[in-house]
From Swiss-Prot:
Subunit structure, as described in the record: Component of the srb8-11 complex, a regulatory module of the Mediator complex.
InterPro entries from the UniProt entry: CDK, Kinase-like_dom_sf, Prot_kinase_dom, Ser/Thr_kinase_AS
Location within or outside the cell: Nucleus
Gene Ontology BP term (one): positive regulation of transcription by RNA polymerase II
Domain of life: Eukaryota
SUPFAM superfamilies: Protein kinase-like (PK-like) (SSF56112)
Record's protein name: Serine/threonine-protein kinase SSN3
Length: 431
């Protein structure tokens, strides 16, 4: 009986593959938006429907793979690269599982997931802008700073999305301008949940699973000090950094990251330069304003490598960038508290006096703006999905037998991203 089941499994899978809708049969690819270590993100629209103008972002993940036959330089006798697929990345699994469950107006909406020819495609609603793009636009000398009403709306919406995540026992762990999308109607959408994780009942310590989280400029001080256990407060520190960047149009703590030794990946180096940038603005932390300071693994490194005692300088920094709103400064102080136990929570930040004073928070962050932000740069010199579709058709013609030669013939496709384009700042992790 078991033998018969095994024999009929192949034809069944083949029939299933023939009936499964492919990416290109459902969506028309307009071009690709960004590329990174995870794969690529494409702009697309539906085919053959009344809502053909509805736009989508298709995130195609690279498969975790490794090459074999190293004695032959990873190529077969015909010169084609030999690739063995080993599964789905942990970040892809996390993002798929979390996005399927989350439904909030300030979180990017997952529309569909398609598995096709060993590639995973996540279909999201499309957002025309992100905060990195908006900040970059306003950083041009001829353009005025971001209006206060726009900053207020953007930050409130970010906090609203973060509150929703935290209420559902999820922290994002990679909040930064490039991961904050904004729709054409001025609605914030927090994206890229690849590092997000549930924290109510973890099976192992958070540090064990991911030793390095949050992009360095937005990384909370407790993480820089090697915290093995941390709280959602790390997301609020990142929101504070984003608020400061919206006000000043440049990262407030722009340090240089010390890279992990490739020969000792278990050891994470102390990020001296990044911590230096923080103390220059916030002052040197002490046991008085951070009682648990000496409990962190990197406390000794902190004492030995950062010997200068800096006074608090955030108020002067705030004046230097031309800001004067006192409540906005108080909100910034609350988000950038050293002690995570004292730092503002997302729900408390939502009702901060800054958001209660005039001008009122607008649901549309672009309300009243007399400018239009440029649309995302779309790159059309890419045929990665097209190539994948051709492979899939070949796969089906052969009754499910994978044609390695056909697959490998597409490995030399030029998918380079113009990192120097002035209209769209490149990013490693973008929606």
């Amino acid at each position: 009986m078991a033998s018969n089941s095994i024999l009929t499994l192949g034809p069944f899978k083949h029939r299933k593959d023939l009936t499964r809708e492919s990416v290109l049969s459902t969506y028309q690819i307009i071009g690709y938006i960004a590329a990174g270590t995870y794969g690529k993100v494409y702009k697309a629209k539906l085919k053959n429907t009344a809502s053909a103008e509805q736009l989508f972002a298709i995130k195609k993940f690279k498969s975790d793979n490794h090459s074999s036959n190293r004695s032959h330089h990873n190529h077969d006798i015909n010169g084609n690269e030999i690739v063995h697929y080993t599964g789905i990345s942990q970040s892809a699994i996390r993002e798929m599982s979390l996005c399927r469950e989350l439904n909030n107006k300030n979180i990017t909406k997952l529309v569909d997931i398609i598995l096709e020819n060993k590639s995973i495609y996540m279909i999201f609603e499309f957002c025309e802008h992100d905060l990195l793009q908006i900040i970059h636009y306003h950083s041009h000398p001829e353009v005025k700073p971001i209006p206060q009403a726009t900053v207020k709306s953007l930050i409130w919406q970010i906090l609203n999305g973060v509150t929703f995540l935290h209420q559902n026992w999820i922290f994002h762990r990679d909040l930064k301008p490039a991961n904050i999308m904004v729709s054409s109607s001025g609605v914030v959408k927090i994206g890229d949940l690849g590092l997000a994780r549930k924290f109510n009942n973890p099976l192992q310590s958070l540090y064990t699973g991911d030793k390095v989280v949050v992009t360095i400029w937005y990384r909370a001080p407790e993480l820089l000090l090697g915290a093995r256990h941390y709280t959602p407060a790390i997301d609020l520190w990142a929101v504070g950094c984003i608020l400061a960047e919206l006000l000043s149009l440049r990262p407030i703590f722009k340090g240089e990251e010390a890279k992990i030794d490739i020969n000792n990946k278990k050891s994470v180096p102390f990020q001296k330069n990044q911590f230096q940038k923080i103390v220059e603005v916030l002052g040197t932390p002490s046991m008085k304003n951070w009682p648990a300071l000496n409990k962190y693994p990197e406390f000794i490194s902190f004492q030995q490598q950062l010997t200068t005692n800096y006074p608090p300088n955030l108020v002067n920094w705030y004046k230097m960038i031309g800001s004067s709103n006192k409540q906005c400064l108080e909100l910034l102080k609350g988000l950038l508290e050293y002690d995570p136990l004292v730092r503002l929570t997302a729900d408390n930040a939502l009702v901060h006096p800054y958001f209660l004073e005039l001008p009122k928070v607008q649901e549309n962050a672009f309300e009243g703006l007399n400018l239009k932000y440029p649309k995302r740069r779309i790159y059309t010199d890419d045929n990665d999905i097209i190539s994948n579709q051709a492979i899939n058709q070949n796969f089906k013609r052969h009754g499910g037998a994978y044609d390695d030669q056909h697959n490998n013939s597409n490995n030399n496709t030029n998918n380079s991203l113009n990192a120097n384009n002035a209209n769209n700042v490149p990013r490693k992790r973008a929606r």
